[in-house]
């Protein structure tokens, strides 16, 4: 037996390899793979079912059909191994060689490989510098191509039609050489001198100035260099020998009834062989040219169809009218080789069943049905039975198990003990979708699942199924226990909060037992401790909610980690005292001394984890669950129709609203308001009414009046069941209660617009037919949305995983000083996310100073944990520069310091953690909770009134950043800068609120002044944009000619007149070139200069501007010279939810992006064209002016003569991330993408750590474009991996050479996935054909750095425990050690095996 094992070990020899190279196969190489030429199209003999000789299934070429048996049956058995039968020519060996032996077909005429021809950009076309159309005409025998011009005036690779060719033949005779078909193309490719061509192109590149030409030349140079470096020959793109796939990979299977099922490839091969043989015959017969030509064309088409059916012309179809599946189709798509068989395989030792609740299980257990366990652990049971001597052979053991003898169950118990199993629920959206549990054997057929892990699986018990997998090897069991056990996954990797959190019943139970009630039985008692409290409650002496005093002993950890006891009498309730019994030592009593809602319970577990660690938390979580269930059952909380209390005020509120609507209707009929205004007002009225009803309803539900001990009335929080469920966070929400007991409110039509008559009824009162009908639409839309959402969200996750899969933590510290500055997220008056939440678990990039001093508060490279964050908060620090993966300097992967804390474990991240995949899962998993729709601004959905002032909420001092302002005549400040920000700072120096202040706003308070809460600090007119003068003087009109550039309008009511500047479109011919402006002069008529510059103060007026001043009027600084009406922002759709996230990660340019200043300087306008104006920015320090054409309809934020900085907004709109990167740098674009993505998730209440989004951004910034190559081998304008530029520059600098300059590129995630260094990963993602073609031509090496590549080639992935294995391998190879080789040679092993087999299985074949 030992020898047998040795032999098997020797058989499965593992190849040690580090990279995989892909290249073009030369004809000789194809022949060297082949075991013989396939000459006939026959497959198998229809009578004998034996393969035909020289056919597609020929046994002589591909190997025997039966193990160790030749075709004619002369040689059978192992002893003849390796003999070649002289009768039928078949080698006697295993039949599995039919899976690996290839054949070949010698093509009678060369044929082009369709991938290199048609996969755009066409490689053959690029190499020959001929249009694809022309090449196709040559290949398919429509025209000739000149191969050798000789002494004639014909160029090489010139295309000739039939007539031109005949004329040339007459003229020059055989001076020149022209051919058609693939031979011609092959000859052209063969005669190319790649190096010389390359030199010539490089010279051309240096001379040319045209952008398009440069692009084309660089493309050709890259291709030619790829050919030179990879050792591929261009003529190999034309096939002369066609390889034939091994027959077992394109099987022919007999069905019952004498029919055969065959792979489509056989049909395709048959066509090729038939046409090839016919062509050979025609050539032997010297048939007329036209016939041969036709046959060659047909051969070319047959080969095309075999390689990639349907790529050119119509796809070849089989008998059933469906296109045949070609070789290319075999590997691409979801059903192709990559995604179906290499990335996702079915596994053995697995089962699935329905899940039910296991409320009595411990957190690390799951209930496994005995039937399933018996089947899954069969091999272990057989082994144990044999080991114990209970069964003599495996066969006997098998019989015992089938009979289910009593002893088998005992053995099963033993086998299962301490052997974890994996439970998985599809869809596995993040890594918590597969966790390990210890199985507990149960009766029945359903798997029992612990209720607390349902949140991680997103499982419920309405018929969900789960799969069970058994880790077999010791290593697998170890990993399952140490890494995947449910008890080790308490925190969510997405945000670091507990994910093992009680929900629903448990929350309700805990909430109920921690509530207090006035005048409950037993109120005012003083108890000796929690035990007495429980005794009183059990014996009925006191109610759960009674307010009592209890003696409580708390334990606190001191500096040495010892517990210190502290006992005191505390006011609490009986229920809370009982709950205290399960709280672990070391937590304060205050944690349970409050009504516990879902949030409070989550916080409680989190605190427990941070203070006490993993084990106590797990035990605590389990105990909370048992307690919660028990007390939920005792509470008797149920839902009855009387719990839905309808507010008494409802009828009168609705009546009032109806009266208001009637009034608006009258105004509309008398023509005072437009139809649109009426609609909007009606909807506003109803939205307000709905809010009032729901407020009245909640007030009503929230409190109830009770009599206290002294007989007085007192208000207390209600014990209404529905209210308790919503308040505790167990089930339901205020919005749902509103529909039950308030009014349903406004509904939307299918197109998203709001129906102006609301549903005034609620579900308790019931809906009438019309109301019900209006409601059905929304319900159906919800279902349709969900279905779409799931698919879209899944696709987003797939793209994210693909772009980030090769990002792994590879070193401890890269030593970079870079980082990104974190500030709290403040929108308007509220802090959306405090600084603490953003920097927790990050590493500081520089010393954090105490505000206002030079003292170091936190040193550089400190991991900010909870304690450090408390220090930051105490010192009211409001910006911290932290390390970030985006700025990490590691070449491949990132370093632990730049990543910071591993969110799921709570300590700094380990090397080898696959942070890319974790990030992708964390962003993708909540994708299904995001909305799918784009919101139309319409109705009450989201109509914010145009803001016209800033009102602060808190008291504090004002700070204005990047503000310019002037003082107007009444002494107020007027803002004259564009992107001014107003921050409110409280007395500790913390930023509380932040607002944008528009140009022309009048400030009531200035920078640094104190304000009280509720004070208005700035106001402006939202409908017009003013032009404000910065200097005082007299107005002088220039180019303001009545009737040409301006018109005078008089208001009928007031009699005031104003001038309106005409748009250039409305002007007469004479006024086209005039530039109306207001100039400011002093009393003597000299120009006044703008302070701090030598520019005269003159303000050019755009079209539609309104001037209310006359020529020569005196004005003071800060006055409004003119007003430009703002068109209200139109009703732009806000893209929200999932599509918005996808747009951000795909880095799509918005429709009308903001126009940003490319350089810093002074703005002026050049000559206008028909629809555009010319913006010129002249740098202050001289240098070339930058020009840009801007469409006239864009509203500009700058006036002529204004100074702008690089990256300033010139015209409003959504900013394009590419512009932000180009003009403001990596930090700014990171901040933009992170904040925008977070906005979408925050709206849905989903918490994701910023890190994850930064990880994806890092991958989007993977490429750089070379601006100037320096001494490197890069080409100018070439797009290369950023890490490669960094490494190259480091080497160049070390050798004192000129390094390359580059610009970072932002790629969308799909683009970035396809642009990865690894062609295996890219090919398995999308566009398989294109990726493989490109890689083959370039002769690419895949270094197998990422996860995906390694999964595909079947190695351990370089992450987690596989990371150590790969590091070890590298180390051993560097040290020159060889992997331990098997001690036994193959010859010895096979000999001993033969002996064994012949001895043991000699006579009896009839087992």
UniProtKB/Swiss-Prot annotation:
Molecular function as annotated in GO: DNA binding; DNA-directed RNA polymerase activity; magnesium ion binding; zinc ion binding
Residues that coordinate or bind Zn(2+) 1: 70, 72, 85, 88
GO cellular component, one term: DNA-directed RNA polymerase complex
Binding site for Mg(2+): 460, 462, 464
Positions annotated to bind Zn(2+) 2: 814, 888, 895, 898
BP term (GO), one: DNA-templated transcription
Catalytic activity entry: RNA(n) + a ribonucleoside 5'-triphosphate = RNA(n+1) + diphosphate
Pfam annotation, one family: RNA_pol_Rpb1_1
Taxonomy, superkingdom: Bacteria
EC numbers for this chain: 2.7.7.6
Cofactors demanded by this protein: Mg(2+); Zn(2+)
UniProt xrefs under SMART domains: RPOLA_N
Family according to the record: Belongs to the RNA polymerase beta' chain family.
Quaternary structure, from the entry: The RNAP catalytic core consists of 2 alpha, 1 beta, 1 beta' and 1 omega subunit. When a sigma factor is associated with the core the holoenzyme is formed, which can initiate transcription.
Main function: DNA-dependent RNA polymerase catalyzes the transcription of DNA into RNA using the four ribonucleoside triphosphates as substrates.
Annotated protein name in UniProt: DNA-directed RNA polymerase subunit beta'
Organism: Cronobacter sakazakii (strain ATCC BAA-894)
